[in-house]
Amino acid sequence: MAQNKPVKKIVLAYSGGLDTSVILTWLKDTYGCEVIAFTADIGQKEELSGLEEKGIKTGASKVYIQDLRLEFARDFIFPAIQGNAIYEMRYLLGTSLARPLIAKAMVEVAEKEGADAFAHGATGKGNDQVRFELGVKSLAPEKTIIAPWRIWSFGGRSDLIEYAKSKGIPVPVTAEKPYSMDRNLMHISYEGGILEDPYKEPDEKMFLLTTSPEKAPDAPEYLELDFEEGNCVAINGKKMNPLEIMETLNTIAGKHGVGRVDIVENRLVGIKSRGVYETPGGTILFLAHRDLESITIDRDTQHHKDKLSIEFAELIYNGHWFSSRMKAVRAFITETQRYVSGTVRIKLYKGVCSVVGRKSQVSLYNPEMATFEKEELYNQKDAEGFINIYGLPAQETARLRKK
């Protein structure tokens, strides 16, 4: 068992909340070794000042706080958009994309500090335990992984509070939310508590990123998004880096109530779970990018990519970001993006994001071929021979079975 394997130094994924504060102290008590706390800024908008001091007071030998927002946008969110990654046709994978980045950063800290173990606060019923641990196994297979929620005897929040008080750990005085929330640059997810009844509508006061569509502006807003090789590089002609793109689109789309989704998804561990998500900027990018592909990628390649996008999303959701299969899938996706450059015009209005225009210097759309007016490039008479050959299997099957 993990708790019986001797370890010398642990890197803990640390938020400063009740769970990871208790875990920090519990690790020191259980393993009698040095614990380094690691916090990633991935756009969660939480107050990070004072976190280092709190971690040290709770028992950490060091506290790392790293700003990973640009890397998250550039190396994780944007590749997911290029691959049209959407799990079960609804979920844009905000949480799933963040976990491998955090695992990667923790491995780098462990190598720098000579740590031989990792710990996290993910529960034994969720997907995050898999994502964290597969990331570590892929990047540092020799390291030990400690998952306290699968080891200790604490049953819930009340047990943690009692333990924290006994150890002098500051307990947050804020009221517990009636649901769990996870926020980053891509989205906010809400799960559990009052949301466990899949028929109950969420309280409007829950939403933080998006305005209620009913209260959104009465006039639509138009945006022009410029893409180069599948990546958004400018909004309304203004060049921006991936972090700036995400922050700008989150603000604009949120104002118009765009990006809410309420779903029941299939977790990797076999449980069905209700999730409510706000993904304003990601929703715009997903729709705009896929639309631009429609005029810049040929039919057969696009159809194959659409099929592969399902597998791509499942690989992300299931924690396989660093796997060999993921590398192969991403290589195909990257090749398809060579000509996905152009401009997409978006209309935002009361919760709806609509593509209303697209153009590209490398477009495969030929109006002279598509026109219903006078034809010069397309001879309709050619269709007869094509249909005769294309329909031959169906025709012969029907003819022979009638005998």
From Swiss-Prot:
Pathway: Amino-acid biosynthesis; L-arginine biosynthesis; L-arginine from L-ornithine and carbamoyl phosphate: step 2/3. GO terms for cellular component: cytoplasm. ATP binds at A13, Y14, S15, G16, G17, L18, D19, T20, S21, A40, G121. InterPro entries: Arginosuc_syn_C, Arginosuc_syn_N, Arginosuc_synth, Arginosuc_synth_CS, Arginosuc_synth_type_1_subfam, AS_cat/multimer_dom_body, Rossmann-like_a/b/a_fold. It is found in: Cytoplasm. Keywords: Amino-acid biosynthesis, Arginine biosynthesis, ATP-binding, Cytoplasm, Ligase, Nucleotide-binding. Homotetramer. Belongs to the argininosuccinate synthase family. Type 1 subfamily. NCBIfam families: argG, PRK00509.1. This is Argininosuccinate synthase. It comes from Leptospira interrogans serogroup Icterohaemorrhagiae serovar Lai (strain 56601). The lineage of its organism: Bacteria, Pseudomonadati, Spirochaetota, Spirochaetia, Leptospirales.
